[in-house]
Amino acid sequence: MESLNSAAGLCVKSRRVEEIAMPAYWVARSRVTDPVEYKKYTDPLPPIFAKYGGNVLARGGRFQIMEGPEKFGRFVVIEFPTFEQAVACFNSPEYEAAAAFRRNGAGEVENVIVDGGDATPR
């Protein structure tokens, strides 16, 4: 947006710079050891993710490990509007209550939240 400062008799152009929010991705790799208890963890998750703007992109579908150990057998990818919203969801009381079922021996999970976009220095 450009504006002219005519009150001071100057012709000055100013630009408003807006920061564009990048999405973030919560990636979970899981190994289920007790399916009944694990379901108590997964059942309440969709509305919790939605509350924080999360959108499940992949959950429990077909996969192929291309490289590395075959330790995990379930994969989930959730997109959030921002990194901060994804972290807030993970740290929320609602998620903590659900995760308690998994943490009590129903499965092993590796959770990672990563910013979208290419942040590699050039």
Predicted regions and their residues:
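Short S/T/G/P-rich N-terminal loop/turn motif that feeds into the first structured element of a domain
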Residues: 4, 9-91, 115-122
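C-terminal structural segments of small proteins and small subunits
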Residues: 87-89, 96-112
